Amino acid sequence: MKKIIITGALGQIGTELVIKCRERYGTENVLATDIRKPEPHSPVKNGPFEILDVTDRNRLFETVRYFNADTLMHMAALLSATAEKKPLVAWDLNMGGLINTLEAARRYQLKYFTPSSIGAFGISTPKVNTPQLTIQQPTTMYGINKVTGELLCQYYYVKFGVDTRSVRFPGLISHVKEPGGGITDYAVDMYFKAVRKGHYTSYINRYTYMDMMYMEDAIDAIIKLMEEDSVKLKTRNGYNLSAMSIEPEMLKQAIQVYYPDFTLDYDIDLERQDIALSWPDSIDTSCAQEEWGFDPKYDLPTMTKVMLEAIEKKQKEC
């Protein structure tokens, strides 16, 4: 990977992916793109940036040509909870952007990455230690988009030889960007509220287990997968990833190690709760481990320490 374009670069994953890729491959070799301008203090502003609507195919192709890209990391998407509120917008953005970026990868012979999600599973999926290959019948527009995306990526690999790669991300925890419309974002919000208010009201019920992972592990996983020799990848699209399976009470207890007076109560959002219940409690990540060495470094205690320290630092700087 020598010249990388990242779409959705101002999103939760995109922002940190841009930072890491610029550190690893050189600032001028990573073009960040998004549909809006970066905020004045955005870390993305330290290098090349273009406003890009991924549903505009001609503009996308033009951007690939002028930057002379060899890799496209497509992160632009409407997330799970937001997609349920705006299903037609979600279809147009998530599927239109996906097919356009896949076409760009085919036409210009790009290495290609896009994330899938645990949202690609549904209520008929085995809930504990969910296998890599299993039933996928999601009940949300976001999940339908993700399953379709996995199939399209595999189609472009088999039909056209495009070097497509993707992973099924769990909930991702980060202090760089605040919650952005995902079902698992309660966990991120709980950390911020613990520092700022000492209390959090969760919209997800206790004992609702979902897979999670610290963002640094997620970014490292993308880069590790993209740098792996193509011949070693048997699964290729939609690798299960997770670092931990947690529920709100577990997160509360981890926070109370540092904030003993932190309190948690519940005001359940039934729509988001139903979506959470349709997802696995835990997933099997053995394919990612065996094929390209997936090995997350952060568990719940280490993630909690890092998250709280980073948010405290932000508070002092405000």
UniProtKB/Swiss-Prot annotation:
GO molecular function: L-threonine 3-dehydrogenase activity
InterPro entries (alphabetical): Epimerase_deHydtase, NAD(P)-bd_dom_sf, NAD(P)_epim/dehydratase
GO biological processes: threonine catabolic process
Organism: Staphylococcus epidermidis (strain ATCC 35984 / DSM 28319 / BCRC 17069 / CCUG 31568 / BM 3577 / RP62A)
Family assignment from sequence similarity: Belongs to the NAD(P)-dependent epimerase/dehydratase family.
Name by which UniProt lists this protein: Uncharacterized epimerase/dehydratase SERP0194
SUPFAM superfamilies, A to Z: NAD(P)-binding Rossmann-fold domains (SSF51735)
